[in-house]
């Protein structure tokens, strides 16, 4: 899912940059001759963790536009663009949210919704999706993305990411402390402060733990996808269009689909890789929709 990948990647980058800057400014100071100040570290981790997640959320829309080259439709130049605008407007009214920006970008069949607030979101679809699906199926995809916005998934995920970030920042520094103590235990000139071992370990652990923690975010995302599918069915008055859209996408390239298809839940990754998948298997999604009939 493109919006999830962008959010997580941006979040990891923001946290890494914040850590480096704060360390250079001397704010990252929890170690003294008395040892590691855990309460102070926890407060610091909470502030950095949630600040990083919030910054990632606030810049999610411009980042998505930039990374995909999405062109926001301000004045429809074709009947397809006019239909897209009209469809999103109708779906948004049914969902009770303000009209999102609508964008189109070149690429494989894909779609995403992003934005910091329900009433200032962005819904984007690829040219590949428009070319490979019927209008009924495209409308189902649009309904799915509008449901994400109406459900407040980006904001909710920010809270989840903030909690995850807190643990990542906290644990990275605890590990850094013990590694640094081990490296400097024979240094008679050590004054109990932070050494190079601490700095390097924290930076490495932060990236590694951040990637590992994305498993939690992915698990959360998979559960939100079922809600978005159900939301699309409610907006359209029937689960059939969404089922058709998923089936269509599943048949575009059986068993071997490009990474870009992740946003529509087609990348049914086996084994260990499934832990990092932001979407449940397409068969499970269709089965869940079928149970609504």
From Swiss-Prot:
Any one cellular-component term (Gene Ontology): plasma membrane
Record's cofactor remark: Binds 1 zinc ion per subunit.
Keyword annotations of the record: Cell inner membrane, Cell membrane, Hydrolase, Membrane, Metal-binding, Metalloprotease, Protease, Transmembrane, Transmembrane helix, Zinc
Transmembrane segments: 4-24, 39-59, 159-179, 200-220
Tree of life domain: Bacteria
Keyword field contains Ribosomal protein: no
Localisation: Cell inner membrane
Cofactors that this protein relies on: Zn(2+)
Family under the similarity heading: Belongs to the peptidase M48B family.
Database matches in NCBIfam families: PRK05457.1
Protein name as annotated: Protease HtpX homolog
Taxonomic path: Bacteria, Pseudomonadati, Pseudomonadota, Betaproteobacteria, Burkholderiales
């Amino acid at each position: 899912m493109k919006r999830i990948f962008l959010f997580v990647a941006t979040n990891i980058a923001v946290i890494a940059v914040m850590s480096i800057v704060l360390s250079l400014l001397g704010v990252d100071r929890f170690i003294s001759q008395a040892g590691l100040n855990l309460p102070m570290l926890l407060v610091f981790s909470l502030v950095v963790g949630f600040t990083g997640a919030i910054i990632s959320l606030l810049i999610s829309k411009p980042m998505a536009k930039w990374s995909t080259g999405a062109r926001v439709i301000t004045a429809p130049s074709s009947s397809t663009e006019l239909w897209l605008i009209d469809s999103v407007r109708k779906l948004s009214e049914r969902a009770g949210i303000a009209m999102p920006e609508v964008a189109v970008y070149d690429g494989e069949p894909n779609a995403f919704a992003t934005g910091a607030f329900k009433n200032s979101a962005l819904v984007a679809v690829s040219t590949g999706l428009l070319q490979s699906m019927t209008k009924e199926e495209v409308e189902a995809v649009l309904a799915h993305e509008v449901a994400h916005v109406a459900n407040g998934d980006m904001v909710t995920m920010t809270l989840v990411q903030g909690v995850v970030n807190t643990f990542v920042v906290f644990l990275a520094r605890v590990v850094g402390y013990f590694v640094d103590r081990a490296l400097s235990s024979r240094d008679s000139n050590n004054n109990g402060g932070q050494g190079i071992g601490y700095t390097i370990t924290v930076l490495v652990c932060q990236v590694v733990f951040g990637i590992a923690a994305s498993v939690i975010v992915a698990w959360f995302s998979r559960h939100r996808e079922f809600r978005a599918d159900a939301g699309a069915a409610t907006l359209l008055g029937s689960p059939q269009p969404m089922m058709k859209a998923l089936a269509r996408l599943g048949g575009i390239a059986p068993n071997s689909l490009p990474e870009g298809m992740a946003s529509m839940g087609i990348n049914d990754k086996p084994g260990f890789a499934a832990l990092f998948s932001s979407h449940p298997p397409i068969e499970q999604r269709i089965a869940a929709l079928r149970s609504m009939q």
